């Protein structure tokens, strides 16, 4: 069985085709990386946004290249940069740029006002960094930056899955949902009361799944829900092995280890991954 994977990163978009051998191991048939190159120049030093539609176009071209060369691919897996969001309308169309995880609108000092991230920490007792999707969304609500036609939001790789399959409503894996902030990784749900306190209409929240599910099909191949890039890198490098440290250096960097129980502490984040991927 052959499968293709697409990783939409901040600076590059990568893909791979794997074949499962008789011994159960995966053999890499081909890997390919192209530049993302879709950042939008704005007049705001704190703003880090990208052309979402151009990113998807480049990702589709890469995927189509693989499907033409390896026609027996049966499944398509997705991953990519976490935390950032795009807005979608009722038809599942993207109606905004990608507000990336590097965006700093949540950390802006405006006169005597404290930054949004500090307000969230004081009012909700939640640590949510600038660049987290719901921090971005709250800022956009307050500054009338949410597109009029938007009804929900998701990550760029979730939107890519919607684009491929024609899905109209986002379905987000828990590994990506947690990256938006305001998410209880122990109970596996958004903290809706705290979001409502911050002025968020919780009807905008995307649907969340705890397992990798089928989104639909693209050119006759099954497309599954995207997972977070941290979880995907751990899966690819360490599988489900415990007592292994994974050092991942991309645009950002993390050290991760698998844990059978939920744990939180200063500088440590528990990210759901079947069990827990503890990331620092």
Predicted features and spans:
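N-terminal glycine/serine-rich phosphate-binding loop of ATP-dependent small-molecule kinases
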Residues: 1-96, 122, 149, 206-207, ...
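Gly/Ser/Thr-rich active-site cleft segment
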Residues: 8-10, 121-230
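Conserved donor sugar-nucleotide recognition element shared by glycan-biosynthetic enzymes
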Residues: 55, 59, 106, 133, ...
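A generic secondary-structure signal
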Residues: 61-69, 139-143, 237
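Residue-level signal for inorganic ion chemistry
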Residues: 76, 103, 140
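Residues that line or immediately flank small-molecule/substrate-binding pockets and catalytic motifs
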Residues: 80, 102, 212
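Glycine-rich phosphate-binding loop of actin/hexokinase-like ATP-binding domains
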Residues: 85-90, 94-111, 150, 154-190, ...
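Conserved FAD-binding subdomain of flavin-dependent enzymes
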Residues: 114-120
């Amino acid at each position: 069985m052959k499968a293709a994977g697409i990783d939409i990163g901040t600076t590059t978009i990568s893909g791979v085709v794997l074949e499962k051998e008789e011994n159960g191991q995966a053999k890499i048939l081909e890997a390919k990386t192209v530049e993302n190159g879709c950042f939008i120049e704005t007049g705001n030093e704190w703003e880090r946004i990208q052309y979402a539609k151009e990113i998807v176009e480049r990702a589709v071209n890469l995927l189509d290249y693989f499907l033409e060369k390896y026609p027996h691919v049966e499944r398509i897996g997705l991953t990519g940069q976490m935390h950032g969001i795009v807005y979608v309308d009722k038809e599942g169309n993207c109606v905004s740029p990608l507000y990336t995880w590097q965006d700093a609108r949540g950390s802006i000092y405006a006169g005597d006002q404290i930054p949004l991230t500090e307000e969230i920490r004081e009012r909700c007792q939640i640590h949510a960094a600038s660049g987290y999707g719901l921090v971005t969304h709250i800022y956009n609500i307050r500054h009338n930056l949410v597109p009029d036609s938007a009804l929900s939001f998701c990550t760029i790789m979730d939107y890519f899955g919607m684009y491929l399959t024609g899905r109209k409503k986002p379905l987000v894996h828990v590994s990506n949902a947690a990256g938006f902030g305001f998410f209880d990784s122990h109970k596996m749900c958004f903290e809706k009361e705290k979001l409502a306190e911050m002025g968020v209409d919780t009807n905008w929240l995307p649907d969340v799944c705890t397992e990798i599910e089928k989104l639909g099909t693209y050119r006759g191949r099954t497309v599954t829900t995207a997972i977070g890039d941290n979880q995907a890198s751990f899966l690819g490098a360490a599988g489900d092995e415990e007592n292994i440290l994974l050092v991942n250096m991309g645009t950002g960097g993390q050290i991760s280890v698998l844990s059978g129980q939920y744990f939180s502490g200063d500088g440590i984040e528990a990210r759901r991954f079947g069990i827990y991927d503890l990331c620092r």
